[in-house]
UniProtKB/Swiss-Prot annotation:
PANTHER family: CYTOCHROME B, CYTOCHROME B_B6 C-TERMINAL REGION PROFILE DOMAIN-CONTAINING PROTEIN
Source organism per UniProt: Mastigocladus laminosus
Name of the molecule in the record: Cytochrome b6-f complex subunit 4
Quaternary organization: The 4 large subunits of the cytochrome b6-f complex are cytochrome b6, subunit IV (17 kDa polypeptide, PetD), cytochrome f and the Rieske protein, while the 4 small subunits are PetG, PetL, PetM and PetN. The complex functions as a dimer.
Top-level taxonomic group: Bacteria
GO molecular function, one term: electron transporter, transferring electrons within cytochrome b6/f complex of photosystem II activity
Membrane-spanning residues: 36-56, 95-115, 131-151
């Protein structure tokens, strides 16, 4: 806030510029052509130049070539499917695993009905929804990390 300087509207030069439609966006400078024609292409080309420079200077390694005759011990899904994979892998009954996965959206649907007397939007004033969100986030992270461990170390994350 200390770096912002308010314009001096008593300055006749500034008032003349504003009367002609010149000045800062805050004072009604039109987006066309000022931003859309001049500023946006510069930002887009600068971003493109950064991406090209990074790809030329530090190319990503593709990895080792695939060997169709040697499969890994355990094939893992993509990282965003780790929690679901962990539920299916650790629960002995697969139907129970599918029901556990279906209970997540059903539980999220029930949260507004559990806390229907609280009309606040501030998360600190909605303790039930905040607690459920934080608990679900921690369980999801725990399941996601546990999916990368062998099955015997998956619940303790290899710590104990």
């Amino acid at each position: 806030m200390a770096t912002l300087k308010k314009p001096d509207l008593s300055d006749p030069k500034l008032r003349a510029k504003l009367a002609k439609g010149m000045g800062h966006n805050y004072y009604g400078e039109p987006a066309w052509p000022n931003d859309l024609l001049y500023v946006f292409p510069v930002v887009i080309m600068g971003t493109f130049a950064c991406i090209v420079a990074l790809s030329v200077l530090d190319p990503a390694m593709v990895g080792e070539p695939a060997d169709p005759f040697a499969t890994p011990l355990e094939i893992l899904p993509e990282w965003y499917l780790y929690p679901v994979f962990q539920i299916l892998r650790s629960v002995p009954n697969k139907l129970l695993g599918v029901l556990l996965m279906a209970s997540v959206p059903l539980g999220l649907i029930l949260v507004p009905f559990i806390e229907n007397v609280n009309k606040f939007q501030n998360p600190f004033r909605r303790p039930v929804a905040t607690t459920i969100f934080l608990f679900g986030t921690l369980v999801t992270i725990w399941l996601g990390i546990g999916a990368t461990f062998p099955l015997d170390k998956t619940l303790t994350l290899g710590l104990f």
